[in-house]
Design a protein with these regions (language model features):
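An N-terminal structural lobe/cap that precedes and organizes the functional/catalytic core
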Residues: 15-104
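Conserved active-site and cofactor/substrate-binding residues in soluble primary-metabolism enzymes
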Residues: 67, 71, 104, 138, ...
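Short cationic amphipathic helices and targeting signals
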Residues: 59-63, 121-124, 131, 201
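N-terminal mitochondrial targeting presequence
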Residues: 1-27, 270
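Mature, matrix/stroma-exposed regions of nuclear-encoded mitochondrial and chloroplast proteins
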Residues: 154, 212-216, 223-224, 230-270
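An internal, amphipathic alpha-helical element
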Residues: 166-235
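Internal, conserved structured core segments that host functional sites
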Residues: 107-174
């Protein structure tokens, strides 16, 4: 009886208020048994059984780092009954590099990251709650000081709403550092910055000053502080934190794999 009443109510609401129910496409089922990596002309491609992987635009999927290719093949192999692309961050980043859906050039990405620095999350500290401000100063300021020393800049935190002003040379120094990376690695930078809302924390991760777990904790500092007062829904907040850690870890690995000439050495039988 309850099911019938629910159906009637849904039908009446939909017809009266013209409510449209959004239907999301179902995840495709896994259609392959095993994954592999093949190499050709210094490029590495991913195979699903005997078929080579393609990008969303239908272009041949390839990377120039063997460790990255193995990691991507592992992502596909980790899919069970269905293929959940939303959790395959290395695959998504590599496809973005190949397809370049937004037609971004290297200078576009560098400018985006440099401009983001002026609105970096950890430069804006609380002006209302003293305990929160003290926590931010204790946890965020050491990373800001490291960033200033590492890149020869002078960024200062603020507890107001005004955008911090940069000293002469700041933009040039940060741009020079970011421009030393190729376009693929910069896509990883951009993904990490969008995850953390912080260029400073991203650079600290890439340079191994802090771990991805620590970076996520610092990015969520105010949220964690509020949860300490109001309580938390364990599974919901834990899932959110772990999702950020997965996204950030994938981004940092993507930067590493596209910034080094690392290859996997296979054992040779004698």
């Amino acid at each position: 009886m309850f099911k019938n009443s629910a159906k009637v109510l849904t039908r009446l609401c939909s017809s009266t208020y013209n409510i449209s129910i959004r239907k999301y496409p179902a995840h495709p089922k896994r259609h392959y048994r095993k994954t592999g990596v093949v190499t050709s002309n210094g490029k590495f491609e991913i195979t699903l059984d005997q078929r080579k992987l393609k990008t969303p635009k239908g272009a041949p999927f390839f990377v120039e780092s063997e460790p990255l290719a193995i990691a991507i093949a592992t992502e596909w192999d980790a899919q069970k009954d269905i293929i959940d692309r939303s959790r395959m961050h290395l695959t998504a980043l590599s496809s973005t590099v190949i397809d370049n859906p937004n037609n971004l050039k290297k200078t576009d990405i560098v400018n985006y990251l440099v401009n983001y620095t002026s609105t970096d999350a950890i430069l804006y500290q609380s002006s209302e709650e003293k305990r929160l401000k003290d926590l931010q100063v204790a946890e965020w300021n050491p990373v800001i000081e490291w960033f200033n020393k590492r890149y020869d800049v002078n960024l200062e935190p603020t507890d107001g709403l005004e955008v911090p002003t940069f000293a002469p040379g700041t933009v040039m120094n940060v741009s020079r550092y970011l421009s030393s990376y190729n376009e693929a690695a910069l896509q990883g930078f951009m993904f990490a910055v969008d995850t953390l809302k912080s260029v400073i924390l991203t650079c600290a991760c890439v340079d191994r000053f802090i771990t991805p777990e620590k970076a996520v904790l610092l990015a969520r500092l105010e949220e964690e502080y509020q949860l300490g007062h109001w309580g938390r829904v364990e599974w919901a907040h834990d899932i959110s934190k772990l999702d950020l850690q997965a996204r950030l870890s994938a981004a940092i690995l993507f930067v590493y794999f596209n910034s080094s000439n690392a290859f996997v050495k296979q054992k040779m039988s004698i």
